[in-house]
């Protein structure tokens, strides 16, 4: 049976999986969501005997029903290969009283690789299935990690071009160097003088501009997205939660059917939403702990039922979570509104005009399985140092936000359920913040000296992604104001 995807803002706009992947964003700014989430049709015990690629197939076949077995397996096997530095793809590591799901073993050392290594294959397959003749222009806003992972995924992929916008002063030095040294004839990287929300708003505006779309079509182009608003990003992220659970079954930590908790450092809400969708598919998850940094708009939402972006935007050492407009939350709002597109659209309109909305008590009651928490900069830094000293395990700043929030959650609730923490980036991506947390004396060293010091401390080999940018030349130096984003796109495309 074919699974239908529907817009969160218009019940009449539907798409197949491949059409939703191609389009990225629905009309009127809506997001595509599945009409229902099919239950896993393989037992958890059987999944525990499978490798990552096999688990991926069992999850994705249920969500991407218009792909043939051959097409889907080709996408999966092309994505999850030697680009990852471990055959496990996403190893689970038991440290400091929790199970860290290491999602940073791909080519750009952040969790975005888990979905962005497969998205180019899903997208080009979708284009073939739908007889698309236009060149696809991937338009992406990044708070740091998506940009590089999308660039790496789409570099020199025939029939595509990719344009990435990032906040010029809102990413780590390593993140910026990774992006501006990107090779590939079809890649274009632009720093904007605003913050991530400005970049994301600018991208969404171009997506929903019908005049621009028809002009692009005349010139032989069409937009798609590599952001987590694209269902082709979200579904591959469901896989690693299923995989993590089955590893716990495999090593005897839990029995199939036992419940686990998950803690996810959260910005745009895609990663934690993927865990929620995995539960809808039948994965026994009891609690979703949503971890925020000082930009705690989600913590406030889960605590009060009011989403309010009218606040100061704070630059932190966990920049991938420096977000005040959390796009994927809309998919959850739509769900708790009883899949009511009209109700959801009204709330989203309020958000865009007034910057705030409040959900009903009935909707809030459906969020009981979510817990919100946040970590200050000082707490995040202290956690990095504490876990290094107790377990000789070095985590990045985003993972440290999650670990801090998890510790607070356990203290407040006494909940000892086995817990998986999504470890979303390698510490090598945020060396300065990580090393200065361990010892302030490191402040005097350069970024690449710190890379070598981290290698000595952690005993973990310097990832290829970092070696590659040590001496790489800067190939992208365009900077623009947020108002100039559309003209920059047209210039790159020569239209």
Segments (PLM) and residue ranges:
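PLP-dependent amino-acid enzyme catalytic core
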Residues: 1-495
């Amino acid at each position: 049976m074919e699974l239908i995807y529907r817009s969160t803002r218009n019940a009449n706009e539907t798409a197949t999986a491949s059409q939703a992947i191609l389009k990225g964003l629905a009309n009127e700014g809506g997001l595509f969501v599945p009409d229902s989430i099919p239950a896993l049709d393989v037992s958890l015990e059987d999944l525990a005997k499978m490798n990552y690629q096999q688990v991926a197939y069992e999850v994705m076949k249920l969500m991407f029903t218009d792909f043939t077995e051959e097409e889907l397996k080709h996408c999966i096997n092309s994505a999850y290969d030697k680009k990852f530095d471990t055959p496990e793809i996403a190893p689970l590591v038991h440290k400091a009283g929790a199970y860290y799901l290491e999602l940073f073993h791909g080519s750009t050392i952040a969790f975005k690789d888990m979905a962005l290594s497969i998205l180019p294959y899903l997208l080009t397959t979708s284009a073939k299935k739908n007889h698309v003749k236009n060149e696809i222009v991937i338009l992406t806003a990044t708070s740091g990690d998506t940009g590089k992972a999308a660039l790496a995924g789409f570099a020199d992929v025939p029939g595509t071009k990719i344009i990435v916008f990032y906040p010029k002063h809102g990413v780590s030095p390593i993140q910026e160097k990774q992006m501006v040294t990107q090779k590939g004839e079809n890649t274009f990287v632009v720093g904007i003088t605003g913050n991530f929300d400005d970049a994301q708003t600018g991208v969404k505006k171009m997506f929903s501009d019908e005049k621009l779309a028809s002009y692009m079509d005349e010139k032989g182009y069409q937009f798609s997205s590599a952001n987590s608003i694209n269902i082709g990003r979200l579904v591959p992220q469901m896989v690693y939660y299923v995989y993590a659970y089955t590893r716990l079954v495999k090593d005897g930590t839990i029995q199939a059917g036992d419940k686990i908790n998950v803690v996810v450092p959260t910005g745009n809400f895609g990663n934690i939403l993927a865990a929620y969708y995995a539960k809808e598919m039948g994965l026994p998850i009891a609690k979703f702990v949503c971890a925020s940094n000082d930009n705690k708009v989600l913590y406030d939402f889960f605590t009060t039922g009011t989403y309010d972006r009218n606040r100061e935007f704070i630059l932190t050492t966990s920049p991938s979570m420096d977000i005040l407009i959390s796009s994927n939350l809309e998919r959850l709002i739509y769900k708790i509104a009883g899949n009511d597109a009209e109700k959801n659209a009204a709330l989203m309109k309020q958000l865009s005009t007034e910057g705030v909305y409040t959900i009903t008590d009935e909707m809030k009651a459906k969020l009981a399985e979510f817990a919100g928490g946040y970590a200050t900069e000082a707490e995040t830094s202290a956690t990095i140092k504490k876990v290094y000293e107790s377990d000789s395990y070095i985590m990045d700043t985003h993972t440290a936000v999650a670990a801090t929030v998890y510790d607070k959650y356990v203290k407040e609730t006494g909940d000892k359920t086995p817990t998986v923490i999504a470890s979303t980036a390698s510490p090598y991506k945020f060396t300065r913040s990580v090393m200065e947390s361990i010892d302030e004396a490191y402040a005097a060293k350069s970024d690449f000296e710190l890379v070598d010091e981290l290698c000595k401390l952690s005993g973990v080999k310097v990832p290829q992604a970092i070696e590659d940018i040590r001496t790489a030349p800067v190939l992208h130096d365009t900077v623009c104001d947020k108002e100039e984003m559309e003209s920059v796109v047209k210039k790159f495309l020569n239209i």
